[in-house]
């Protein structure tokens, strides 16, 4: 699992994340290997209610270990892609692989940028009102760095202009 990702553009809806190579031997992690094989992936928004479980399945287990079982998270079938999504997630994006870009020299510490097109959005009805996600109900967390995460409960709005005044 990855606690960080970024939107790229909206036409088509595109998203990216950056898996690193394993720290002790530089090999590609299972997430990347699975994406290479299936050409598909799912991104789930992590709410604080299952943040600890998300971190628990980030351990680099051998590929024969099921992180769903070790973390006690629950997979559910996706609608359009093979990889499952999380039943705990109130927002999930089913994605088709667009491209993988390798960054660095292929050793530990280097990594990849994975770019995918979102082909299906899942948004729980309980957190969606008038065309907007209610952040207080989603209660998302984000990774800052290392073992540090943040909550989205102290935010403010800054209105930006789409184009300059005439």
For each of these PLM feature ranges, what is it?
Residues 1-166:
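Basic, polyanion-binding surface patches
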């Amino acid at each position: 699992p990855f606690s960080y990702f970024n939107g790229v553009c909206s036409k088509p809806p595109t998203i990216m994340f950056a898996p690193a190579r394993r720290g002790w031997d530089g090999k590609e992690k299972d997430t990347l290997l699975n994406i290479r094989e299936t050409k598909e992936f799912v991104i789930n928004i992590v709410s604080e209610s299952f943040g600890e479980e998300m971190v628990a399945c980030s351990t680099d287990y051998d590929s024969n270990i099921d992180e769903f079982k070790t973390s006690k998270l629950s997979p559910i079938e996706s609608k359009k892609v093979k990889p499952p999504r999380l039943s705990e997630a109130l927002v999930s994006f089913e994605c088709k692989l667009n491209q993988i870009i390798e960054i660095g020299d292929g050793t530990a510490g280097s990594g990849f940028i994975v770019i995918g097109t979102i082909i299906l959005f899942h948004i729980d009805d309980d957190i969606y009102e008038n065309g907007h996600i209610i952040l207080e109900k989603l209660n998302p967390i984000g990774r800052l760095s290392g073992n540090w995460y943040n909550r989205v409960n102290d935010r403010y709005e800054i209105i930006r202009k789409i184009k300059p005044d005439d």
